[in-house]
Regions:
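Short helix/turn-capping signatures at newly exposed starts of structured segments
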Residues: 1-120, 131-133, 139-172
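Active-site beta-strand termini and strand-to-loop segments that position acidic
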Residues: 125-130
Length: 172
């Protein structure tokens, strides 16, 4: 089966990074709604933090999480989703797209702080000077990006530190 991903343009990716990643943190849910509207993404009727995206404009495909009105993470697709029958063929094109977006992030934020790859799943984590995490990754069905607030990144690093010191076990 032949399938070609719809891919977010480099310029639009950088525009999203500048608005969501490089601008001041913490961000409020109201900031998230304003950014959603700025980019022209349409919200769910009953969950305004879930909305459409550039590469999947007809489906609710992006979202942000918030606790007590403060954003913890923002998740958006870099590609559309490959149909299930294409998954065996779409892994290599997805990895090419993933590597391309990793190069963009490397130019902006330096080398990835963490990389992982298990079978058809892959992910790289970049950290900005202000402590914002940018994770790009995917599988044979899609490539996506997750932006994590400095607070979420701190919590994750503290958890990893406590596991490494043996104070807590990995599954707690």
């Amino acid at each position: 089966m032949s399938f070609e991903f719809t891919v977010l343009s480099d310029d639009r990716f950088v525009e999203i990074l500048e608005a969501w990643v490089d601008s001041p943190w913490p961000k409020t849910a109201e900031d998230g709604y304003a950014l959603r509207d700025h980019f022209g993404w349409r919200p769910s009727e009953n969950k305004p933090n879930v909305f459409t995206s550039d590469v999947v404009p007809d489906e609710l495909s992006a979202s942000f999480t918030s606790r007590q009105g403060v954003i913890g993470s923002f998740d958006f697709p870099i590609t559309d989703i490959a149909p299930e029958e294409a998954w065996g063929y779409s892994l290599e094109p997805a990895k090419v797209i993933y590597r391309h977006f990793c190069e963009i992030l490397t130019r902006r934020y330096g080398k990835a702080k963490q990389r992982s790859s298990k079978k058809e799943r892959y992910r790289s984590t970049f950290v900005t000077p202000q402590g914002v995490g940018v994770k790009v990754g995917g599988n044979d069905a899609l490539v996506s990006c997750i932006v994590e607030s400095p607070e979420e990144m701190f919590i994750a690093s503290e958890y990893a530190r406590l596991v490494a010191k043996g104070y807590i076990s990995e599954d707690e």
